[in-house]
Amino acid sequence: MSNKKADSKPQSRYPVNLLDTPFPMRGDLPKREPQWVKEWQERKVYETIRAASKGRKKFILHDGPPYANGDIHLGHAVNKILKDMIVKARNLAGFDAVYVPGWDCHGMPIEIQIEKQFGKSLPAAEVMQKARAYATEQIEKQKVGFRRLGVLGDWDNPYKTMNFTNEAGEIRALAKIMEKGYVFRGLKPVNWCFDCGSALAEAEVEYKDKTDPTIDVLFSFAEPEKTAQAFGLSALPREEGGIVIWTTTPWTIPANQALNLHPEIVYALVDTPRGLLILAEERVEACLKLYGLEGTIVATAPGAKLVNVRFNHPLASAHPGYKRTAPVFLGDYVTTETGTGIVHSSPAYGVEDFVSCKAHGMADSDIINPVMGDGRYIESLALFGGLSIWAANPQIVEALQGAGSLMRTEKYTHSYMHCWRHKTPIIYRATSQWFAGMDVKPNDTDKTLRETALEGIENTAFYPAWGKQRLFSMIANRPDWTLSRQRQWGVPMAFFVHKETGELHPRTLELLEEVAQRVEKAGIEAWQTLDPRELLGDDANMYEKNRDTLDVWFDSGTTHWHVLRGSHKDELQFPADLYLEGSDQHRGWFHSSLLTASMLDGRPPYNALLTHGFTVDGEGRKMSKSLGNGIDPHEVANRLGAEIIRLWIASTDYSGELAISEEILKRVTEGYRRIRNTLRFLLANLSDFDFAQHARPVEDWLEIDRYAVALSTNLQNDILSHYDKYEFHPVVAKLQTFCSEDLGGFYLDVLKDRLYTTAADSVARRSAQTALYHIAHGLLRLMAPFLSFTAEEAWKIFQPNSETIFTETYHAFPAVPDAGALLDKWTLLRAARSDVTKALEEARVANLIGSSLQAEVEIRASGARYDALTSLGDDLKFVLITSAATVVKVDSEAEEAVEVIASKYLKCERCWHYRADVGANAEHPTLCDRCFSNLFGNGEIRSAA
């Protein structure tokens, strides 16, 4: 820094070295921050950082793409700022830490927006054109918001899943996993949203309470002789009755095709006024009570004995369309926790039902599937054709009542699947889809996808550690991945399918590459406009284009393929060092990325996963419009500053929920002011210091200065170990403690006398400034990852010839040879000082003294404390900030004490110390000898403080 004082002030007769700085006390963050954002863009600071970091070891934090729809919210701010802090910390640690932001662009939310604005009848080409334009507009809007938060990155060259290169890359990734044998087509129940008109990924399902009618339904005996044999009877005592099921989905009854019993559960044949009822023995008493019946158990048998015994459909007497029977199949998933211990099976609408029926030999063509994609029954369905399944529920209950099959019904509130976009109930629905098989063994390894992914989890670092088990259990238990979707705005599964057999064209892999080349030039629109004859020639008449698009989780889940090794391969690399997202992404981006990389590369695309929690209000409640407790990051940035948001995030343990409220923000703002005041003191007292000209070597430093630098070095090492583990809240806590207690409450307080009163160019003052110079260097760099605006503002004053603090690396503190001994000694001294400070406060309360400088103290000390105190000699009073200090040796800690007396001497006009030599010089009657020497003589000699 220059040796010029910042402002000229009226000169005192006896001036002190009281300097100023252009670094203001008030941050005025809402006004200054946008200026820094503008300057960083205009000066291309991100590019400057890249140039400075070139050749270093790379560190890649791969950005999980937010969806290109809507304004950024507080969750976005948390996510992007955490990423920004890590990237900046890694750059400062000496890495080439690149940050390429990205956006997820295809899929339902944008398609819904286009439908809202332009209706549902637009041609596909127009939907795509408008979807691209809409996504581009949303990206630009979000980009401005992220930059405003101080996030540095390659904003002018982000990745977008809708860029032609990326769309083509997805098609090539699909071809690769097909080549390996992971992809198959089949009929399976998948999560289906009627409003989307499409299958949903597991990550697109949320659970909310829903109230439905539950029903206990009687399936009458169709094979009484076989039933009797199963129970070890020669014949049934009576013909009336049957087997009873319980379900929360009456709408599935028309599609019933089987009944499931557990092979080992004991079932009872119970004689009741309603006939013979088959129930799980454990549930007999509870069920009869609910039905208002009494009964006697006639016989019992394990479920295995009843296999393949048939029962009549409960609506058989209501309409000929239901004159069919349901066989008993066995299933280990059946329990006796609720219901009757018997599960009715509609294989089109339940995963376990489907698996059970298929395992018992049911062909796909035999599966009854009357629910259409919009949630209505097909018109030909008996009794309920054309009705919505939800509207049909009460009518089905009524029809069962009329048929004599209804044992009981009541309303039941349970946690039920909903679409995360439409917030409407969804169902399992069997459709013909393309899947990636979790338990398929590909042709290049003997491990299944599930095994490869689970092995990859074992080799991944998790922050926090509990994320490992969460992801592991999800992968271990998940079904096959439904890759296909029935939408327009998405990357096509660009297959040609035989019109009669449904088989893929034998040249599918080759054709996918040809389509990818066209998409690379013209986008996915190239597939929509493609005439099959262009690629198939004479085969075109036998094949049709597959109309399915890829799950958008495949879009983002393959960014390690089409971004890290595709569109941005020159900047990025595979695998990424870190993926960082909210805890919901264990079933989202972390999950899909793991599966695609396991298929493509046999390993995860990341070396480590970091998970952060969600934002809640001060009372721990989830933020919602209905509660009115949401906090808009733009509003906070414009009112308090983005720096306050950044400091709040950094100071909160992100591994759990991140609580925010006006009271919390107020506390964060107060903490920010303390840090800013510390910086202002440092910069002001370095404003006449030029390192090249004024710095003193370590051997010339006063003891307390060596201690302060040794303490700062330890702090930096401690903080860097936290940065290495992506732990920010301990960093903030320790920096704030350092600023308020180690610096403000001790070192800087002690230093003021030396900085202000010794000769401007004295060894004592330059020693202090040299230490402050190193402390400022260290502190600014340590805080730069989270207080980026403030660190840059201070840095430009501190080091005006440097382009930006973000091209620096962490400060190399000079080695202090006696650091260990000093740290031990000054720990003792600070403890003694605390005792003195307490005694001074008691004296002040008793009106014995005013300021501490009015006091003289006598310290009675023993052992190491005595040695430490006496080693400072006459400098002890400066450490205690008293006018005089003496130390008396005692034999034990029990005898230790502090005595305070008011000084009887005059106060020096300049240094405010009370000294016997004030007025000793007749020409300067208000000065002490120390100040006279500092102003007009050779200056005082300091050794310790």
From Swiss-Prot:
SUPFAM superfamilies: Anticodon-binding domain of a subclass of class I aminoacyl-tRNA synthetases, Nucleotidylyl transferase, ValRS/IleRS/LeuRS editing domain. It catalyses: tRNA(Ile) + L-isoleucine + ATP = L-isoleucyl-tRNA(Ile) + AMP + diphosphate. The keyword Protein biosynthesis applies. Its cofactor is Zn(2+). L-isoleucyl-5'-AMP binds at residue 581. ATP binds at residue 625. PROSITE patterns: AA_TRNA_LIGASE_I. InterPro entries: aa-tRNA-synth_I_CS, aa-tRNA-synth_Ia, Anticodon_Ile_BEm, Ile-tRNA-ligase, Ile-tRNA-ligase_type1, Ile-tRNA_ligase, M/V/L/I-tRNA-synth_anticd-bd, Rossmann-like_a/b/a_fold. A motif ('HIGH' region) lies at residues 66-76. Its EC number is 6.1.1.5. CDD domains: Anticodon_Ia_Ile_BEm, IleRS_core. The keyword Nucleotidyltransferase does not apply. A motif ('KMSKS' region) lies at residues 622-626. One of its GO terms (cellular component) is cytosol. Keywords: Aminoacyl-tRNA synthetase, ATP-binding, Cytoplasm, Ligase, Metal-binding, Nucleotide-binding, Protein biosynthesis, Zinc. One of its GO terms (molecular function) is zinc ion binding. GO terms for biological process: isoleucyl-tRNA aminoacylation. Binds 1 zinc ion per subunit. It is found in: Cytoplasm. Zn(2+) binds at residues 908, 911, 928, 931. NCBIfam families: ileS. Monomer. Belongs to the class-I aminoacyl-tRNA synthetase family. IleS type 1 subfamily. Catalyzes the attachment of isoleucine to tRNA(Ile). As IleRS can inadvertently accommodate and process structurally similar amino acids such as valine, to avoid such errors it has two additional distinct tRNA(Ile)-dependent editing activities. One activity is designated as 'pretransfer' editing and involves the hydrolysis of activated Val-AMP. The other activity is designated 'posttransfer' editing and involves deacylation of mischarged Val-tRNA(Ile). IleRS has two distinct active sites: one for aminoacylation and one for editing. The misactivated valine is translocated from the active site to the editing site, which sterically excludes the correctly activated isoleucine. The single editing site contains two valyl binding pockets, one specific for each substrate (Val-AMP or Val-tRNA(Ile)). This is Isoleucine--tRNA ligase. It comes from Paraburkholderia phytofirmans (strain DSM 17436 / LMG 22146 / PsJN) (Burkholderia phytofirmans).
